């Protein structure tokens, strides 16, 4: 298949720049790929789509304030670092701007020296490995000095950084939010649980690769970025029991889908406690092994995320749904509206 097969017209004004005042006030497009039906709804009605005995699976990763602005100690030139992943100890892989001035041994100071980054290795595409030195606890220093790494298509300043976290965010490590989860409130989750739906959490730390465009025409040549995931034994046992009793596995977002399908592919459709790195690329032709339904936001044209949704619901039907969303003025991307796919 070709990347252009997943293109669609999207007016720029439909890209949501700020979150709605109420998380669950967003619109919800419910699409049923078997019956080829579409229903316009609101997100708090997702309760109607969930049945007693189902499991709702959410990614509890927490976004780090991973964008740091500092200056080189020798020249005082401005430097921007974006933390991508913790490689070991105080060493991090980062994306640096301007990268060409940051050679091995270069020191960058943040917050009047409260945090120092020393470049230990040069990588391609502006990547660097740096080692941080600081007093106290690294995450506390980062919380005070760092900024939220909002996606490149969001140009408005985020007034409340909690709005780029899910209400159940717990495990530090993401460079971007698992945005399908931003719509849930604690009250809505309580109602879902009261209905007899199991709430299950896994972790996948979202990397910046989630925003990288597909740069090849032939999808078979595209290589996905790797992201760290983890599923506990308790969560795996709960999900297997739900499956065995006839309930559905309903994933919140593409990160939850990719984690579940990675593990299901390893263990013949069964779920087991597991952790590691995944670069699974779910595109049309993929046979789903675990996920029965899911919620997700509206994604970028020609993105791997549109391809994932198309793998589940069919490309033509998904593009039809996207065109409907454009006509009905749904809001797109991270702070936008949602889709429930069954």
From Swiss-Prot:
Its main location: cytoplasm. Keywords: Cytoplasm, Queuosine biosynthesis, S-adenosyl-L-methionine, Transferase. It catalyses: 7-aminomethyl-7-carbaguanosine(34) in tRNA + S-adenosyl-L-methionine = epoxyqueuosine(34) in tRNA + adenine + L-methionine + 2 H(+). One of its GO terms (biological process) is tRNA wobble guanine modification. It comes from the Bacteria. Coiled coil: none annotated. InterPro entries: QueA (IPR003699), QueA_dom1 (IPR042118), QueA_dom2 (IPR042119), QueA_sf (IPR036100). It is found in: Cytoplasm. The keyword Membrane does not apply. It is an enzyme of class 2 (transferase). One of its GO terms (cellular component) is cytoplasm. Pathway: tRNA modification; tRNA-queuosine biosynthesis. GO terms for molecular function: S-adenosylmethionine:tRNA ribosyltransferase-isomerase activity. Its EC number is 2.4.99.17. Transfers and isomerizes the ribose moiety from AdoMet to the 7-aminomethyl group of 7-deazaguanine (preQ1-tRNA) to give epoxyqueuosine (oQ-tRNA). Belongs to the QueA family. Monomer. This is S-adenosylmethionine:tRNA ribosyltransferase-isomerase. The gene is queA.
